[in-house]
Amino acid sequence: DDEFAEAFKNVVLEHNGMTVTCDTGYFNKKENWISMKGNPKCLLENHELSGDSIFLRLTPDGKGLKSALVIQNAHGIQKEPRKKRKPGTHTEAFGDTLYAEFDGKKLSRLYVNLNAHGFFFEDDLPEYKNLMEGARLDLSFKNGKMERATISGSAQSTYFYVKKNRTVAGKNVALGDTIHIDFAPEKNQVKQLKVQGGKNPSSGRYINLENKESVKDSTKKGNPL
């Protein structure tokens, strides 16, 4: 049947710029989905997904990736290359379950559930990793850049503020039940940070790394932009 294919042992599938490897794979051409088990990995331009099992939903024309569901030991990587004077970015997320949506070849949304944590950094400052940790992560992207993040359930976050001359001025540190962060994607900077309390005490502060004695509350506003 040309509409359905299955393969076993050292499976490698190449499809419109996407490479899939696994031990067991199923490809339903009619319904536009791919299911993988056994060390599955999905590689596409600037993105990599891995976990215990992966389910891919293709676009209606079958040429692109619409969404991906990774179940157990989920790991997602996104790398945006440098553009003109703007450095490239590296984002990683981990958790029990990961769901990703794509717009063309760009990641538009990333949702991680249970034991969720992640980080991202700019390629010229790899030692300054911006951290996220909680029960759940819900990240949205614009043109490949992170635009909004919601961290829920014993949420923690750390984000560095980088000046125009590419020196690190300070960092935001936040704790709470839920943390909402809005970014300025074109600047790779935190625009606003809000912390909600509940079962866990909430706090948000900005630490000036140029003057380590200077610490101020940042619960409502993330960076001194």
Residue ranges and their predicted role:
Residues 1-225:
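Mature-chain termini and adjacent capping regions
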